[in-house]
């Protein structure tokens, strides 16, 4: 789903560079993406992390001399129509290049990742005197506990100006985990996917003084059908094009054997089936190897695999109304209607690409990725 609009035609973008300790270095306003960036792209995600790249002219941009590895790039957006400015993206520069183009313009190019990638740099170690790092509680609080253990307790591993939000119990799912030398980011994603009732995100504070890891019942606004202010994509609302409703029937999986831990006769096997689908479309069985998963969670794993691989249906479409930053942002939950079908989605990711090089009118392409939450057909 891609929306192409004139870059910042009615609003503005603002870029700010900070030092690794969040000290101010430089900023740049631009109304048409041509004053500083010859190119700029960034991806912002919820429950993960995006990336960014950008290039500026060395001779004219106030940002050029500060484009160093480990500095922080913050992108502000003021949407059209007088809406308030907000932080659309914050990331950490990981690589820089300085070069001369074929047209003899000297540029500085930066590449980096969204701030959420901080959690991708840690492993969960056993607690002192224990075989594992074991936690039990609400899923979102367990996640924050692991982040505190790895990112805050050891002064040699602490990231400057980083903290974890308080435990507020955004999740309603209680679970236990025994972790030993596992990737922190992977554990966080696994817990989040198992619970599927909270979001996580690392954001930069409004005063730019620090990054914060937090969990949310909904990171963005809930604008699904039935909410106080629903956002519905439909042909009647003229904000949808090329809708496609599809159904997959007989070739879907109706029964899944989840192979858990153990060997031989001692191996745990859990069967999950869709009896209604078997009656309609016939029996279709497969196995799924997940020996690393705890036995109590094998059923939920099977339900997830069955949902993904089983008889199913979907509604795909393209958004044609811009309104990014006004009607919707990353993390928002929205709905769609077509052919008597209703569907709910989470906007998992937004990709923004501003290309001004050799263009009289710079173009901003905005591409949201939607995750289907529920289909009612």
Can you say where each PLM-predicted feature lies in the sequence?
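Beta-strand-rich assembly/attachment modules of structural machines
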Residues: 1-139
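Acidic, small/polar-enriched beta strand-loop surface segments
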Residues: 2-14, 22, 189, 193, ...
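Short structured motifs
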Residues: 37-40, 157-158, 331
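Oligomerization/assembly interface segments of phage tail-like spikes and tubes
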Residues: 41-61, 105-118, 191, 258, ...
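Short, low-complexity Ser/Thr-rich regulatory SLiMs
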Residues: 44, 97-100, 202-206, 354
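A mature extracytoplasmic/lumenal domain signature
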Residues: 58, 114-116, 204, 262, ...
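Short intrinsically disordered coil segments
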Residues: 68-71, 125-132, 231-237, 273-275, ...
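Charged- and aromatic-enriched interaction segments used to assemble
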Residues: 106-107, 111-248
